[in-house]
Amino acid sequence: MAALQHLTGLCGMSAGTLSGLLDKTEGFKKELTAPAPSFSPSLQGRRIALVFFENSTRTRFSFELAARNLGASTLGFSASTSSVTKGETLSDTIKNLEAMQVDAFVLRHPSSGSAEFISGITKKPVVNAGDGANEHPTQALLDMFTLREHFGTLKAIKVAIIGDVLHSRVARSNIHGLLTMGAEVGLCSPVTLLPPDSEKLGVSLFTDLDQALGWADAALVLRLQLERATGGYLPSLQEYSVHYGLTDERLERTARHLLVLHPGPINREIEISNRVADRIQPPGYSKSMLLEQVTNGVAVRMAVLQTLLADTP
């Protein structure tokens, strides 16, 4: 696996590098789920700044757990209680934290390109924990690992990404990563929520959910940002749910057993029904991987931090 200095996105990342991260994740997953987990403190003494300008539950806590499992300490950052409220720029915030001798940055920011920007002004490793509508690479890695763990490979599996693709950083990173690893990707959404360049992405396009589900081996359901219903993208949340909500009734029509993923948080009974979201065992036409994704998120972030801080000279 080629040496990584930063992880700002999956666009342009080689299949070899992706495979290396997924292989390393597999090792950490085995340790993480062992009856008595015991981790090597390979990052002992390292300090990781979690710089989150947006709210987060799964991503922030899993990065914190990943760091602690490897022996590193974390510094929490909240924009609302920092000098950002006094007008301090992102650049100055990062430079000041670097001057405190932190060893790496995990950044979540509402502006697309922010992670790439700070990777150019610091010598420390930068991990993108979500930047605007651009990318969310560790979420895509955990989605890909979840799929690979179930199917044994990513090559030739068909993944339908359903929902608000236009505004989704999760969708973008998954498209880049899955296609690189040889998977087939389908996008299913109202035309108002598809990116204008969708036809150039090398994906299949669907506006009919039944057709997409009949094509797919797995469904990655995206969180619908509720403001889209008032922003002119959708007639109403109810109409969206009728046409694009993942329910047992709709799955039964496809007569296929699908793996169901969702990055969270869930809008229950809008993009996905309670029964589909919570079903982890048969009978039924689907298996929910939502909590498995959360577990895998810790292992993926351990692999990323280990690669950037311990394995890179």
Curated annotation (Swiss-Prot):
Record carries keyword Hydrolase: no
Species, as recorded: Chlorobium luteolum (strain DSM 273 / BCRC 81028 / 2530)
Keyword Transferase applies: yes
Protein's job: Catalyzes the condensation of carbamoyl phosphate and aspartate to form carbamoyl aspartate and inorganic phosphate, the committed step in the de novo pyrimidine nucleotide biosynthesis pathway.
Reaction equations catalysed: carbamoyl phosphate + L-aspartate = N-carbamoyl-L-aspartate + phosphate + H(+)
EC nos: 2.1.3.2
Family assignment from sequence similarity: Belongs to the aspartate/ornithine carbamoyltransferase superfamily. ATCase family.
Assembly mode: Heterododecamer (2C3:3R2) of six catalytic PyrB chains organized as two trimers (C3), and six regulatory PyrI chains organized as three dimers (R2).
Disulfide bonds: none
Protein name: Aspartate carbamoyltransferase catalytic subunit
UniProt-annotated binding residues for carbamoyl phosphate: 58-59, 108, 136, 139, 264-265
Pathway connected to this protein: Pyrimidine metabolism; UMP biosynthesis via de novo pathway; (S)-dihydroorotate from bicarbonate: step 2/3
GO cellular component: cytosol
Record PROSITE patterns: CARBAMOYLTRANSFERASE
Segments passing through the bilayer: none
Pfam families: OTCace, OTCace_N
GO molecular function: amino acid binding; aspartate carbamoyltransferase activity
Lineage of the species this protein comes from: Bacteria, Pseudomonadati, Chlorobiota, Chlorobiia, Chlorobiales
Residues that, per the record, bind L-aspartate: 86, 169, 223
Keywords for the protein's UniProt record, in alphabetical order: Pyrimidine biosynthesis, Transferase
Gene name of the record: pyrB
Biological processes per GO annotation: 'de novo' pyrimidine nucleobase biosynthetic process; 'de novo' UMP biosynthetic process; amino acid metabolic process
